[in-house]
Every structure is written in structure tokens, then in C-alpha cells.
Amino acid sequence: MKSLILSIILSSYAFCDISIFISHNNKLTKVSHKDLANLYLKKTNTINGIKVIPIDSKNKKVFTEFYKKVVKKTPKQLHAYWMKQIYTGNTQPPKKLSKKELKKELKRNSHIIAYDTDSKTGRVLLTIK
């Protein structure tokens, strides 16, 4: 019975909405899945001509779900991608922050874009189901 309850809780968590948000001071008004994928793979550093800095979640479940839904990569594929990027000297993966660290960083830097299951963290641009 305990395992059934645990599996129900975990499966419902896997289907949580993920909010894409930015600082309240950022001028960005919309973002697409493609924009996010390119940004989080560091193929670009702007969206609609506005500079943004992607931040990853330290929460492993939220991180995995975001990359699965938006970037269409598993953790293993993502690891291989970043190893290649680092080895060839191209770029580093986005910085990872906890929710608490992220809230502080959003107040300090208006270029931050991030994701979380808590839509109250910043100004929401997009919700991923």
C-alpha cells in the first residue's frame, strides 16, 4: 500500500507544469520551445534580440523533466552533449541554482531566465504542461 501511494505521488510530480520565468525588469514578453532549446544548449544568448542568461534548476527531477520536454534530451544525451562542448572549448553548461539562490539572482540580474514548478519565483513567460 505504501509503495502504491508513493508511486502515485511520484507520477503526479512527473506531470507537474514547469514555468519559464524571468526577472520582472526584463523586457522579454514571449518565448518558444525552440528559443528555449537553443538557449539552454547555448546555441544563442538572445531571444527576440534581448540578451538572456539561462539558469538550470538544482532540483534533479525538475531539471530532467524540463530537458525532456523542451530540449528533447535525456540526462545521458545531455551529458554527452556538454562533454563534447567543453572538450572542444565551445561553451559551458548553464549555471545551476537552488530556488532560494535563484530568487536572489533574479533580483540582482534582469537577464536571467529560468524554470521551476513554482510559478511565483518570477514573471512567467510560458508554462510547459
Describe each model-derived feature in a short phrase.
Residues D17-K129:
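Flexible loop/hinge segments at secondary-structure junctions
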